[in-house]
Amino acid sequence: MDLYIQIIVVACLTGMTSLLAHRSAAVFHDGIRPILPQLIEGYMNRREAGSIAFGLSIGFVASVGISFTLKTGLLNAWLLFLPTDILGVLAINSLMAFGLGAIWGVLILTCLLPVNQLLTALPVDVLGSLGELSSPVVSAFALFPLVAIFYQFGWKQSLVAAVVVLMTRVVVVRYFPHLNPESIEIFIGMVMLLGIAITHDLRHRDENDIDASGLSVFEERTSRIIKNLPYIAIVGALIAAVASMKIFAGSEVSIFTLEKAYSAGVTPEQSQTLINQAALAEFMRGLGFVPLIATTALATGVYAVAGFTFVYAVGYLSPNPMVAAVLGAVVISAEVLLLRSIGKWLGRYPSVRNASDNIRNAMNMLMEVALLVGSIFAAIKMTGYTGFSIAVAIYFLNESLGRPVQKMAAPVVAVMITGILLNVLYWFGLFIPA
């Protein structure tokens, strides 16, 4: 019975996120948001927009989405929402958008267990090896505010920020081992980024007068988001409900902690402590995303399906799905209603607006590095340097062919192919796992 309820709720969630994408009201991928105004205004057709959405999203689905879910057994935002971005943009009407999204949700839940069982039965442990992705991804992602500072400001401010952020991690690990160092890193990094940006603009106030026309565009874009508030509130409710069912994790900073919290053999007290850590990490990450999501939403009139992502933490901490749904709807609705005020405040500081692109670039670069390093660890764990050699050969084959697989996804895809090849070699008697 529980499985059927989960399937229904997840199908409703993915159906609604696909509908939001179809209405150009909200998407998950930040890179898709800027192209949707062109679709709305008739400068681009759905096929063209859909092809762009596919190109931007498929690498994340193949690398982060599938690998994280196979490793942890938990659904994640990349696996659920990136495909619904594509389906929603491509769909010719609202009914088709909802239907295609719902079908995707059902397929994910019903196919996850068989695939997991198949992979865990293989002689070469592909799933266990993919667990090596987790530590580099989480640790690297926590540095995105710092790398954004490197991109935007001079070496002196970057050096000061680096010392503050990295020493914060050292102090937390040494004296506060019960806290999640990555969540504190993100928070301190964002405080430094906003502080440096605002200080820079205050010093150059005369050069950076507020653009009144820009504010009017902000208000015009916000009104379109508010018009879709009922749909966004439903999605916020469903996300929080799914998170409270212990089958979903919102991001890389919480998914591996929640995997431990929900695993067998963990006492209720230990589980709750881990859930609290995951919620804190998610909240800190959400704070880090406020400038990026708010500025892009105000500039494009397209919101994020999970808002500022605070609904994830709401879901983790809620006692049951009903309470989670109510709180999720309230939280994401409050975010939308506050968006105009946030936009006006951010609009006063051009450096904060400019930080959005730097944040996105920093996150992409860090994820590329982390997935490459994690994939190397995974290949070595799989079968030592035989696995490493095969994975590296596949990775550079992709490079030589002009990257048919996106650079970010290539290392993870290479490791997965390596695992398949090693299992084939085992069945032919050419390879024996150590």
Which residues does each PLM region occupy?
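Membrane-interface helix-loop-helix modules in multi-pass membrane proteins
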Residues: 61-83, 309-318
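A glycine-rich, aromatic-flanked flexible loop/lid motif
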Residues: 305-307
